[in-house]
């Protein structure tokens, strides 16, 4: 639909962190000087991995996608800094038991419903609030930013309780935190670009 020709692309899979991973990669590709424009599309088909008999997860997830375009510029705008980490210690709190190379799909794994997303909400909540807050504080300290300098916080849309707790922990007014999970659900990789699209007129 965009009429693009002679372009190349690739897929990345990192679940809820996928858009940030792609943003980091796209930013560095542009900074290398070899690329002028990059389109990042974020989205997941969460309904295909949601167990509708599990009331802990089925109301949380939704399908959605959006994209952004990165462009080289000489202006003092754009992605100025980033802070990324990965921690596999909480794997058992949020995972899909089968479907990968460790446990290949079989008739038995499907019958046992091992291809659905499983999570322990309380542990995910604690982990998310702590690490999301630490990430914001790290970036702010590294760039000499105060809460007055921050126009918006754009968090992953896991649930409203997490976003509210993060805002309280870092002492940022809740009205500065973008929220769309209340009507779009958790669309995984799609949450951040969907927030940017929905709040575009207010940026």
Give the residues covered by each predicted segment.
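Claisen-condensing/thiolase-fold acyl-transfer catalytic domains that form or cleave C-C bonds
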Residues: 1, 5-8, 12-34, 129, ...
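Flexible, glycine-rich active-site loops centered on histidine and acidic residues
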Residues: 29-65
């Amino acid at each position: 639909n965009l009429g693009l020709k002679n372009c190349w692309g690739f897929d990345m899979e990192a679940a809820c962190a996928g858009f940030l991973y792609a943003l980091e990669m796209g930013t560095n590709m542009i900074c290398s000087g070899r690329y002028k424009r990059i389109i990042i599309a974020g989205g997941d088909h969460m309904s295909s991995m949601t167990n509708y008999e599990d009331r802990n997860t089925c109301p949380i997830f939704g399908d959605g996608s959006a994209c952004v375009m990165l462009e080289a510029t000489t202006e003092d705008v754009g992605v100025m800094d980033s802070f990324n980490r990965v921690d596999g210690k909480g794997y058992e709190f949020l995972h899909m038991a089968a479907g990968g190379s460790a446990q290949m799909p079989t008739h038995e794994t499907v019958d046992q419903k091992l291809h659905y997303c499983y999570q322990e909400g309380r542990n995910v909540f604690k982990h998310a609030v702590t690490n999301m807050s630490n990430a914001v504080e790290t970036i702010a300290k590294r760039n000499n930013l105060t809460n007055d300098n921050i126009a918006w916080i754009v968090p992953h849309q896991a649930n409203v309780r997490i976003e509210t707790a993060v805002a309280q922990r870092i002492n940022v007014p809740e009205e500065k935190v973008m929220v769309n999970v209340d009507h779009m659900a958790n669309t995984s990789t799609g949450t951040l670009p969907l927030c940017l699209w929905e709040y575009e007129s207010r940026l």
